[in-house]
From Swiss-Prot:
Name of the featured protein: Histidine--tRNA ligase
GO cellular component assignments: cytoplasm
Subunit structure: Homodimer.
EC code(s) of this entry: 6.1.1.21
Length: 428
């Protein structure tokens, strides 16, 4: 029986992992430059956490979560990172330790979506969460953080879509306005949207069904219903975005797919590339009621997440696999024994090493060293070991020499780590 990876879940092989390392490293650096520290939360959370915070009528909760019951506990493999971060913030009473908290995370998420280009059932997200700052300046800086990161990794063609959902009173007025708009045309809506109409008509705006798009085309805008405080906040966000020079558009139809958002929300969409319908690179917004909803104090918060697979498709160029600085080619038992010791010494000095322990012919080992892009091939034959020497073949300069076995590790390390002629090989 042939076993394959679960549909929508992919293996990431070594030739691709280097690109992932590059992307993850760039995100860590960028987040830490903005004062964020890494947090790691469990893959499994109580199912109620997501049902309560993301919304019972959202597609994620209704159709896409991987949930199960074990020993009386109802558990879900996390579909996103914000709810878990907020749960950790409350559980560890972080609010009592610092007035403003900035966290970032990277890791896998899981949703039972229909797989498509740039959309998977196991996917990786990088995100930031900021607790404790309610102001529009904070919102604009968060959006600018995302835009700056995309520019850092070479994704230059994108635009930020922004909207405001207001506070609770504004959303209630908007709910009534949407009911008045949709109810006379209920029969034209999809079955899912007809069912959601009374409970949460905002979800209709986020529907992917073309029938709902048609009915929503002339739906009222929440921006027309903002109260004075929400209006001042919204104006402040746009003013700060203008100051920062962020390329953005006001998108009155933007609501995103989760119920916990308040006031500012945003999506970053690619304007070039081959993502098709999956053009959203990042998204987020403010969720000022979540911490209190989890039993904590009233703490404002804002965050975002980015799909890393989509970012990788947009990043220019490919990262080569890390090459060994030294390839050790032992010939005979004494050579093999000495190669084990030498490899350990070189690695302790920071040199990537590959040791060929198959006991093959020298010609085959040289071909292997060359195919790996090694800088040096070190030949350890029994006769050379008996004389206290070893052979070095420089695969860039195409020269071969003999050096004493004693002190060889330091000599090899210096050679392997120096910049080669042309800069084509060697350890990175």
């Amino acid at each position: 029986m042939e076993l394959r990876a679960v549909r929508g879940m992919n293996d990431i092989l070594p030739e691709e992992v280097e690109r992932w390392h590059k992307l993850e490293g760039a995100f860590r650096l960028h987040a830490e430059l903005h004062g964020y520290a890494e947090v790691r939360t469990p893959l499994l959370e109580p199912t109620e956490l997501f049902r309560h915070q993301m919304g019972e009528t959202t597609d994620v909760v209704e159709k896409e979560m991987y949930s199960f019951e074990r020993h009386g506990d109802h558990l879900t493999v996390r579909p996103e990172g914000t709810a878990g971060a907020a749960r950790a913030y409350v559980e560890h009473a972080v609010h009592a330790k610092e007035p403003v908290t900035r966290w970032y995370y990277l890791g896998p998420m899981f949703r039972g979506e229909r797989p498509a280009k740039g959309r998977y059932r196991q996917f990786y997200q990088a995100g930031c969460e900021l607790f404790g700052d309610p102001g529009p300046l904070c919102d604009a800086e968060t959006i600018d953080l995302v835009a700056g990161f995309l520019q850092r990794i070479g994704v230059g063609e994108f635009v930020v879509h922004v909207n405001s959902l207001g506070s609770a009173g504004t959303r209630e007025r908007y709910r009534e306005a949407l009911l008045a708009h949709y109810t006379p045309r209920k029969a034209e809506l999809s079955e899912d949207s007809q069912r959601r109409l009374e409970k949460n008509p905002l979800r209709i705006l986020d529907s992917k069904d073309q029938r709902d798009h048609e009915v929503s085309r002339d739906a009222p805008s929440i921006l027309d219903l903002l109260d004075d405080a929400d209006r001042a906040h919204w104006d402040g966000v746009r003013r700060c975005l203008d100051v920062l020079g962020v390329n953005y558009v006001v998108d009155r139809s933007l609501v995103r797919g989760l119920d916990y958002y308040t006031r500012t929300l945003f999506e970053v969409k690619a304007t070039a590339g081959d993502l098709g319908a999956q053009s959203t690179l990042a998204g987020g917004g403010r969720y000022d009621a979540m911490v209190a909803g989890l039993g904590g104090p009233s703490v404002p918060a804002i965050g975002f997440a980015m799909g890393m697979e989509r970012l990788l498709t947009m990043m220019p160029g490919a990262s080569p696999r890390r090459r060994p600085g030294c390839f050790l080619a032992p010939l005979g038992q004494s050579g093999a024994d000495q190669a084990l010791v030498l490899a350990k010494q070189l690695r302790a000095l920071g040199v990537p090493v590959e040791l060929d322990g198959r006991g093959g012919r020298l010609k085959a080992m040289l071909r292997r060293a060359d195919s790996l892009g090694a800088r040096l091939c070190v030949i350890l034959g029994d006769a050379e070991i008996e004389r206290g020497v070893l052979q070095i073949k420089d695969l860039v300069a195409h020269v071969q020499e003999e050096i004493p076995l004693e002190g060889a590790a330091r000599v090899l390390a210096d050679r392997a780590l120096e910049a080669p002629p042309g800069g084509q090989r060697g350890a990175r």
